[in-house]
């Protein structure tokens, strides 16, 4: 391989697992670049690499929905402690607003939050609701949520991370910046030259610059998030409100499954519902730390309705009952995957 191209690929992280695809594509668009290429050719090649690698970045802008965010919060299955914490925060902000209106002193409150919890426990959903509540309270003008992670903030070579993080922050102004698995910005061992540190420094600076226009919510596993917060005094001073998202119980996962059924017009017999509860209880009792919680329930539902479709594929003139009812056999296919569930 051309040595200069090889250096460039290493710099942007393309010579890793799956990097061969990048090399092949670069071969199509840049094989004419030789050992003595000029700076313009190298810049063009680097731009091409950037345009390819940035497609892998994780970033989603979620505009606020219409409706009552407080009712949406109350309608969530489980998460009673989370609801109490969010309501408590909203009550405090409301009271401070009233005190300010009467000319009284107000207590400073940090709107930034740490969400502890396993995957699929509702952290992203609640972050979106919090953004809308903050808009309702006058804390934020828009209340939208920009959702990202390490890949969406960190560059692949020196000098890219700062501008990239700034770009994400700019999209989040007047709303919430939600960073999932934020602990990945500080690898275990705390490599000082890691690009995650640059992203953190940039975010902390922008939190100060835009203190009235930006709310940051960081989320991830409890122990890892505590390590993340403890890694930087700036994080410790800005994040002082923590909300714990517990794993769902078997009964709650059953309710989540039934919620999907109701939304999509499916039914269960009493016998099949009893089987459903038994299987979710088993999954909860044998889960590992990567268990998907609500995502698991959704996946079981999607696989179950696919199994129903396969079962009825050759039948004609189906009545409403057959079109809507899920059987135990359908659910067995839905629960077939044992990923993140111990024997």
Question: Regions from the language model: what does each represent?
Answer:
Residues 292-314:
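C-terminal helical "lid" of AAA+/P-loop NTPase domains
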Residues 69-111:
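Pre-Walker A (pre-P-loop) alpha-helix and adjacent loop at the N terminus of AAA/AAA+ ATPase modules
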Residues 137-142, 224-230, 236, 245-290, ...:
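Conserved C-terminal "switch" segment of AAA+ ATPases
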Residues 184-190, 198-245, 263-264:
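Canonical AAA+ ATPase core
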Residues 2-41:
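Alpha-helical transmembrane anchor segments and their immediate juxtamembrane flanks
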Residues 142-172:
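Short glycine-rich substrate-engagement loop in P-loop NTPases that contacts/grips substrate
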Residues 106-143, 170:
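Walker A/P-loop
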Residues 307-343:
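C-terminal engagement/docking regions of AAA+ P-loop ATPases
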């Amino acid at each position: 391989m051309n040595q200069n191209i090889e250096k460039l690929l290493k710099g942007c992280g393309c010579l890793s697992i799956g990097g061969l695809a990048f090399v092949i594509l670069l071969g199509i668009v840049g094989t004419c670049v030789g050992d003595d290429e000029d700076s313009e050719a190298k810049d063009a090649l680097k731009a091409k690499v950037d345009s390819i690698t940035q497609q892998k970045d994780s970033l989603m802008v979620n505009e606020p929905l219409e409706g009552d965010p407080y009712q949406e919060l109350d309608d969530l299955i489980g998460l009673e402690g989370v609801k109490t914490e969010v309501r408590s925060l909203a009550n405090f902000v409301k009271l401070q607003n009233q005190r300010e209106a009467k000319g009284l002193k107000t207590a400073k409150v940090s709107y930034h939050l740490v969400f502890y919890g396993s995957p699929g426990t509702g952290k992203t959903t609640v972050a979106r609701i919090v953004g809308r509540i903050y808009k309702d309270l006058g804390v934020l003008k828009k209340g939208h949520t920009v959702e990202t992670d390490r890949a969406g903030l960190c560059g692949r070579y020196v000098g890219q991370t700062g501008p990239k993080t700034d770009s994400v922050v700019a999209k989040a102004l007047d709303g919430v910046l939600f960073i999932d698995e934020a602990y990945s910005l500080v690898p275990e061992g705390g490599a000082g030259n890691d690009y995650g540190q640059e992203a953190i420094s940039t975010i902390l600076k922008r939190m100060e610059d835009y203190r009235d226009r930006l709310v940051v919510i960081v989320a991830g596993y409890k122990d890892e998030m505590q390590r993340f917060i403890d890694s930087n005094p700036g994080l410790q001073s800005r994040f002082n409100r923590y909300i714990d998202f517990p794993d769902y119980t078997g009964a709650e996962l059953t309710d989540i499954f039934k919620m999907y059924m109701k939304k999509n017009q499916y039914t269960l017999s009493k016998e099949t519902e009893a089987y459903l509860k038994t299987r979710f209880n088993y999954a909860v009792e044998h889960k590992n730390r990567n268990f998907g919680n609500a995502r698991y329930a959704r996946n079981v539902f999607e696989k179950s309705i696919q199994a129903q479709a396969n079962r009825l594929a050759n039948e004609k003139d189906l009545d409403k009952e057959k079109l809507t009812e899920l059987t135990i056999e359908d659910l067995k296919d839905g629960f077939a995957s044992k990923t993140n569930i111990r024997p």
